[in-house]
Amino acid sequence: MYDITEWKHVFKLDPNKDITDDQLEQLCESGTDAVLIGGSDHVTEDDVLRLMSKVRRFLVPCVLEVSTIDAIVPGFDLYFIPTVLNSRDTDWIAGLHKKAMKEYGELMSPEEIVVEGYCILNQDCKAAALTNADTELDIEDIKAYARVAEHLFRLPVFYLEYSGMLGDSETVKETKAVLQETTLFYGGGIKDAETAVKMAEHADVIVVGNAIYENFEEALKTVQAVKG
């Protein structure tokens, strides 16, 4: 089994975006703790399967972040299931999850499932629009959601998602301070070693996504920046 509490760095690949085989090899052998496959836009079963089969050639843990029921495929090491705690639509908190379990529950091992308590904080990102997230939150609201994740729902992961923009490091610091058992993931705006170190100072795990497609060489540098 994989222990996510030991992770520090994750690359997130969008199956709807292009990456060369050479880039994928460099990424998978970079020393990152896992490769997460997922996205919020036009994710298809075929694209997920194609990308998974390529990542599977390497030893790095391969994880599917489930964003649509139609793109759940077998063969991943872990399945990350987001529940968007600050969504105004209950489908994104538990409704879609019930549908997924109804269809695939008997096929999925509980040991392979990791539930992420998402808090989406960039009002302009696709994920916020898709999930109808309430992004007008102050730090006390965010800490309250973190406590909901850990103390009420006993979730293994609380995920601060800024998706496309760099968040406030003080917010990450204060959020981390209220978590004892739940692992804090941070994603959004990490584009180079400097921004990686800034967010990794307080988050347990940083997720690097868009930078892979915008400046690949700088994205690669984020691994050693946080793992040494």
From Swiss-Prot:
The cofactors named for this UniProt entry are: Mg(2+)
GO MF, any single term:
magnesium ion binding
- Keyword Membrane among UniProt keywords: no
- Gene3D superfamilies, per database record: FMN-linked oxidoreductases
> What's the Enzyme Commission number for this chain?
2.5.1.n9
Residues that, per the record, bind Mg(2+): 14, 40
Amino acids binding sn-glycerol 1-phosphate: 12, 159-164, 189, 209-210
Reactions this protein catalyses: sn-glycerol 1-phosphate + all-trans-heptaprenyl diphosphate = 3-heptaprenyl-sn-glycero-1-phosphate + diphosphate
Q: Which SUPFAM superfamilies is this protein grouped with?
A: FMN-linked oxidoreductases (SSF51395)
Q: Which InterPro entries does the entry link to?
A: GGGP/HepGP_synthase_I, GGGP/HepGP_synthase_sf, GGGP_HepGP_synthase
- Supply the alphabetized keyword list: Lipid biosynthesis, Lipid metabolism, Magnesium, Metal-binding, Phospholipid biosynthesis, Phospholipid metabolism, Transferase
Which pathway is recorded for this entry?
Membrane lipid metabolism; glycerophospholipid metabolism
What biological processes does GO assign it? glycerophospholipid biosynthetic process
- What PANTHER family does the record tag this protein with? HEPTAPRENYLGLYCERYL PHOSPHATE SYNTHASE, PTHR40029
The protein's job, in short, is: Prenyltransferase that catalyzes in vivo the transfer of the heptaprenyl moiety of heptaprenyl pyrophosphate (HepPP; 35 carbon atoms) to the C3 hydroxyl of sn-glycerol-1-phosphate (G1P), producing heptaprenylglyceryl phosphate (HepGP). This reaction is an ether-bond-formation step in the biosynthesis of archaea-type G1P-based membrane lipids found in Bacillales.
Give the protein family: Belongs to the GGGP/HepGP synthase family. Group I subfamily.
Its subunit composition reads: Homodimer.
Name of this protein: Heptaprenylglyceryl phosphate synthase
- Tell me the organism: Bacillus licheniformis (strain ATCC 14580 / DSM 13 / JCM 2505 / CCUG 7422 / NBRC 12200 / NCIMB 9375 / NCTC 10341 / NRRL NRS-1264 / Gibson 46)
